[in-house]
């Protein structure tokens, strides 16, 4: 049995001087989490470290930031009127990694960006920090990805929850791009933990990068924003940039 205490006070991670000209949504990614420099830092990285003719895929929420701040072409953004195009991007994220790679290369996509919100818990597992997801990033928006892609929800979500199934985490591009692995399922009321999902439990995760740069993967992680590795903040969001492996 494991008991987790949810912290009540959360430090922030931000340089206010560098962000004064930007809207609040870009500082917290549209979540209720504390503002940070993660999006601004990532957009600057994209602008300075990717070819000017690069095409970047992300969910439409962030497309406008990528096109205006990072000055890179995106597949969809807030102004996209084509339902078909938005559906195709949702299908990319919900496809198997191999199927998604075929779609990405067909669309000449060079980079894929995902955004994840998490909360670090007190305690650890063999030295690894523990996390709860579902904070308002793509890990929470995935149910909309699924609906727009018109896939069978029961295959991807545990019953009556927004928690991903093993199939989602292991067989979809989005699941593999979110750098967390479900360790156990915890029932706060009974203080019991389980290896498989049970009604009333919450997934507890550890950080785990699936697409690093030392394997033959469809993507490779080329940039993580600062909050992902900052152990001094509890509630945070982070941005991840993956490069499409064209070989």
Q: Where are the language model's segments positioned?
A:
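Extracytoplasmic
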Residues: 2-247
């Amino acid at each position: 049995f494991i008991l987790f205490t949810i912290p009540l006070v959360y430090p922030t991670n931000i340089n206010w001087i560098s962000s004064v000209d930007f809207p609040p949504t870009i500082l917290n990614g549209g979540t209720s989490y504390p503002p940070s420099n993660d999006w601004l830092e990532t957009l600057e990285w994209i602008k300075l470290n990717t070819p000017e003719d690069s095409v970047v895929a992300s969910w439409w929420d962030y497309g406008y930031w990528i096109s205006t701040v990072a000055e890179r072409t995106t597949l969809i953004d807030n102004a996209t009127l084509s339902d078909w195009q938005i559906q195709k991007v949702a299908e990319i994220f919900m496809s198997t990694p191999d199927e998604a790679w075929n779609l990405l290369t067909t669309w000449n996509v060079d980079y894929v960006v995902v955004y994840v919100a998490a909360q670090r818990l007190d305690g650890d597992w063999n030295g690894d920090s523990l996390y709860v997801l579902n904070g308002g990033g793509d890990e929470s928006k995935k149910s909309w990805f699924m609906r727009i892609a018109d896939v069978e929800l029961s295959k991807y979500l545990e019953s009556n929850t927004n928690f991903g199934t093993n199939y989602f985490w292991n067989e979809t591009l989005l699941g593999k791009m979110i750098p967390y692995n479900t360790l156990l399922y915890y029932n706060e009321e009974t203080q019991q933990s389980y290896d498989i999902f049970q009604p009333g439990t919450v997934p507890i995760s550890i950080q785990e990068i699936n697409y690093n740069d030392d394997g033959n993967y469809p993507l490779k992680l080329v940039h993580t924003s600062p909050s992902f590795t900052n152990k001094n903040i509890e509630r945070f969001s982070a941005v991840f940039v993956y490069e499409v492996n064209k070989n």
